[in-house]
């Protein structure tokens, strides 16, 4: 967990059974890292809150929350039972793999497997094998999603899309050269 931190790079680390909660921080870089099983529910501990980026309880999802100019490059996010949220301004998520996300649907209806915030750039990424309704959700304005490959998503919900831009998020948002195929929606 990082809060109000600046200019930190975490590189070439494999995390097993641990995610991240980075809040109000600037210029944080995750590079060449693997996150295996970063989040799951705590139902057996009688914690029944759903996953949400602002959740103050025990069921937290891996998140960048607020902050700006953070980068996630060449990382793998696998077997996360919660969405992964890259919020804040000017977040870059590039050349990452996201797979096996959300297998028991403990999040709210507006979540994607991966969510990106305002003026964020999501490019050259792959998302596959997800249960929730959207593969990629652009949650704020002026975001860019380009050159991504998304498939085998929406396997546990009845509604959704490969890429979803919310009605309040479409202003200034750009989608280009994304390949979405073989989805349940």
Language-model segments: residues:
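Intrinsically disordered, low-complexity Ser/Thr- and acidic-rich flexible linkers and loops
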Residues: 43-61
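Right-handed parallel beta-helix
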Residues: 6-17, 26-39, 49-50, 66-81, ...
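Residue-level detector of functional hotspots within protein domains
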Residues: 56-63, 136, 149
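Aromatic- and carboxylate-enriched substrate-binding clefts and catalytic-loop regions
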Residues: 117, 139-140, 162
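Intrinsic structural disorder
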Residues: 1, 62-63, 72, 114
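Structural detector of coil-to-beta-strand junctions
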Residues: 19-21, 41-42, 61, 83-85, ...
């Amino acid at each position: 967990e990082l809060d109000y931190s600046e200019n930190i790079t975490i590189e070439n680390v494999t995390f097993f059974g641990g995610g991240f909660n980075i809040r109000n921080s600037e210029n944080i870089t995750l590079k060449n890292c693997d996150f295996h099983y970063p989040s799951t529910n705590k139902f057996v501990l009688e914690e029944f809150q759903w996953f949400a980026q602002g959740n103050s309880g025990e069921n937290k999802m891996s998140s960048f929350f607020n902050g700006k100019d953070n980068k996630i490059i060449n990382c793998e996010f696998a077997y996360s039972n919660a969405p992964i949220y890259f919020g804040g301004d000017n977040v870059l998520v590039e050349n990452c793999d996201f797979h096996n996300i959300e297998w028991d649907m403990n999040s709210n209806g507006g979540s994607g497997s991966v969510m990106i915030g305002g003026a964020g750039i999501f490019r050259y990424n792959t998302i596959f094998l997800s249960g929730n309704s959207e593969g990629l959700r652009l949650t704020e304005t002026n975001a860019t999603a380009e050159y991504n490959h998304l498939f085998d998503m929406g396997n546990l919900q009845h509604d959704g899309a490969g890429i979803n831009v919310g009605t309040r998020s479409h202003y200034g948002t750009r989608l280009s050269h994304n390949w979405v195929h073989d989805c349940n929606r």
